[in-house]
């Protein structure tokens, strides 16, 4: 099993190209199920989750081709021949449930395995199902599968989400694009990835109003056509490498990064002492003086994203003073804390909050990655630590970060990925 070795203490300097956003690419790939025509996607990241979605789309009969040597341009096209999304694929990635809405809207039926670890009623997947039921779908749960059917077309509906779930907004937005009548999604998620999906759907012929707001109005059409669409830059990758520049006292140009997508991340980092300068080619991130503790609470966009919580906590672990990090989106998302404490951090968890008392220096240690964002947080800690850090179980990284060791090494980090 691969691991990453880091010898810390080297300020980063150079440029890192920010890739396409995984969380935008996955739902946009699902749009390939909404038309027989060809959908061409540019700036697609090369990640394990993209490969999983590719396999799932192909399972339904849609051909997915890579049009360039690096695989960043995908072509999707063909007729749906199968409406079942099997457990063997869906278990690998929660976002696999995004095929439910398109399959149901297009074919009138879908059988999709419940995503791994999903408990109906306590996880956001129930919002997908209730919204589709309001649009006329009949849904049953049996043997770990969602069975959904509708007579004729889905019908437009006025849907109020109990919370601004990103996945539910995406699924219902795609389904409503082919529904009969007008659908209003209230308390919809507002993330840039939702905007990107809406723009792709509009380029395919969908009629959507309210993009970027909490209320989306979708006038369903009978058919969508092919299009070409470019995936937006990954704001979480941007924030992660901004933390890398700050924690090492370095200076990085993050090419293609967009300040308008960072929202609360940029504001919070600046308040903590990180300098972020917008340039034509991206964002220049540096730190000239010390960091100081700033409290943060994760919230739906435009609030501070839960996917940046672990990385920010590492930054606070070497900041002057104390800070409180409160997680409101997901339960049990502090699994990186014991590993950071092994490296000398002083973090105490109290329910949904973690109290972080900054230390002057972290120490290298063998640590275990527990999930995607925790993996990157441990790498950040290793970059700042004195001595050698070994991060185990780094396969999590491949789901959301492309060539991390290579990108950081090119900017002066002493880091390598070790196989076996």
UniProtKB/Swiss-Prot annotation:
Pathway involvement of the protein, from the record: Cell wall biogenesis; peptidoglycan biosynthesis
One example of a Gene Ontology biological process annotation: cell division
Catalytic function, reaction form: phosphoenolpyruvate + UDP-N-acetyl-alpha-D-glucosamine = UDP-N-acetyl-3-O-(1-carboxyvinyl)-alpha-D-glucosamine + phosphate
Modified residues (2-(S-cysteinyl)pyruvic acid O-phosphothioketal): 118
Subcellular location: Cytoplasm
Enzyme active site: 118
Positions of phosphoenolpyruvate binding: 22-23
Entry EC no(s): 2.5.1.7
Name this polypeptide is given: UDP-N-acetylglucosamine 1-carboxyvinyltransferase
Native species: Granulibacter bethesdensis (strain ATCC BAA-1260 / CGDNIH1)
């Amino acid at each position: 099993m691969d691991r990453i070795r880091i010898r810390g203490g080297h300020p980063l300097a150079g440029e890192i190209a920010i890739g396409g956003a995984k969380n935008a690419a996955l739902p946009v790939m699902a749009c390939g199920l909404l038309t027989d025509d060809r959908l061409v996607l540019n700036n697609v990241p090369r990640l394990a989750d993209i490969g999983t979605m590719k396999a799932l789309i192909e399972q339904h009969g849609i051909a997915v081709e890579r049009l360039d040597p690096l695989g960043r341009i995908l072509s999707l096209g063909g007729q749906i021949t199968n409406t079942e999304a099997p457990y063997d694929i869906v278990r690998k990635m929660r976002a696999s449930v995004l095929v439910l809405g398109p399959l149901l809207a297009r074919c009138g039926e879908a059988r999709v395995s419940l995503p791994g670890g999903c408990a109906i009623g306590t996880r956001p997947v129930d919002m997908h199902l209730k919204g589709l039921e309001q649009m006329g779908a009949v849904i049953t749960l049996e043997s770990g599968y969602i069975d959904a059917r509708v007579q004729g077309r889905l019908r437009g509906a006025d849907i109020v989400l109990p919370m601004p779930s990103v996945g539910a907004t995406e699924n219902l937005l795609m389904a409503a694009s082919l529904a009969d009548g007008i659908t209003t999604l209230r308390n919809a998620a507002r993330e840039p990835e939702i905007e990107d999906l809406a723009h792709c759907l509009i380029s395919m012929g969908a009629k959507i109003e309210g993009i970027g707001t909490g209320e989306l109005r979708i006038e369903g059409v009978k058919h969508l056509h092919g299009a070409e669409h470019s995936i937006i830059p990954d704001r979480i990758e941007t924030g992660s490498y901004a933390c890398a520049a700050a924690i090492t006292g370095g200076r990085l140009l993050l090419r293609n990064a967009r300040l308008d997508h960072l929202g609360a991340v940029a504001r919070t980092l600046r308040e903590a002492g990180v300098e972020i300068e917008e340039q034509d080619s991206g964002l220049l991130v540096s730190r000239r003086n010390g960091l100081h503790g700033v409290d943060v609470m994760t919230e739906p966009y435009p609030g501070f994203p839960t996917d940046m919580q672990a990385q920010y906590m590492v930054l606070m672990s070497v900041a002057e003073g104390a800070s409180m990090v409160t997680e409101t989106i997901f339960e049990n998302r502090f699994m990186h804390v014991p590993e950071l404490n092994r490296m000398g951090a002083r973090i105490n968890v109290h329910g949904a909050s973690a109290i972080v008392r900054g230390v002057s220096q972290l120490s290298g240690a063998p640590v275990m990655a527990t999930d995607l964002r925790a993996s990157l947080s441990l790498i950040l800690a290793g970059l700042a630590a004195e001595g050698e850090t070994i991060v185990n179980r780094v396969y999590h990284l491949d789901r959301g970060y492309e060539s991390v060791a290579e990108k950081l090494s090119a900017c002066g980090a002493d880091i390598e990925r070790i196989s076996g």
